[in-house]
């Protein structure tokens, strides 16, 4: 293989990566408080830590499940599964145009349920990450190298979105708390 041919193959790969990164660049940004950014980070990181092998697009809704202790994002809604649902339904997730995720938890996510307990354990881990990082910049700089390709691309978009939104509001400190699960669940019930 000649050097030219080798570079051509690398360029094609690079073009695809650049296209994916461009597609994951945030749009429709607004300023966010540090608490809003923490909430967006927590729920977005939950979705991005889930297993999925498909390309997601802003504006579409996906279903989140807890399958044998692992988060799994699916194109298939619970009512479409019938008796073959892979695990406990957690809620609906929507990728916003600013590359953050919104999560609407299912009403079955009640206190002391396995899903509730798994979410509390997840939030404990996120709380430790936020406190250990000391700043948004340090937190967002830590790439999720263990994630599959699509999730890494989306994590890059999330980091860019939060950086820009925090810069618009003049915020840079990491909040000492993470969103309370009970608070999030009760806010959703009030909205319904």
Task: Please tell me what each predicted stretch does.
Residues 37, 58-61, 118, 145:
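A general marker of short, structured functional hotspots
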Residues 3-25, 107-192:
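Mixed-charge (acidic/basic) macromolecular-recognition segments
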Residues 41, 60-65, 122, 149:
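Sequence-level detector for tyrosine residue identity
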Residues 52-106:
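Domain-scale macromolecular recognition modules
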Residues 1-57, 190:
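N-terminal domain-onset segments
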């Amino acid at each position: 293989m000649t050097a030219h041919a080798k570079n051509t193959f690398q360029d094609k790969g690079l073009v695809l990566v650049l296209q994916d990164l461009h597609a994951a660049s945030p749009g429709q940004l607004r300023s966010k408080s540090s608490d809003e950014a923490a909430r967006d980070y927590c729920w977005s990181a939950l979705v991005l830590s889930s297993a999925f092998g498909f390309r997601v697009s802003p504006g579409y809704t996906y279903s989140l499940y807890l399958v044998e202790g692992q988060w799994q994002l699916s194109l298939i809604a619970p009512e479409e599964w019938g008796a073959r649902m892979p695990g406990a339904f957690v809620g609906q997730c929507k990728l916003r145009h600013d590359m953050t995720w919104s999560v609407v938890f299912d009403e079955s996510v009640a206190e002391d349920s396995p899903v509730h307990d798994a979410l509390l354990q997840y939030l404990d881990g996120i709380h430790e990450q936020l406190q250990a990082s000391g700043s948004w910049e340090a937190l967002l700089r830590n790439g999720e190298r263990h994630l599959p390709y699509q999730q890494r691309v989306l994590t890059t978009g999330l980091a860019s979105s939060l950086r820009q939104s925090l810069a618009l509001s003049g915020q840079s400190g990491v909040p000492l708390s993470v969103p309370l699960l009970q608070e999030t669940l009760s806010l959703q019930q009030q909205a319904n």
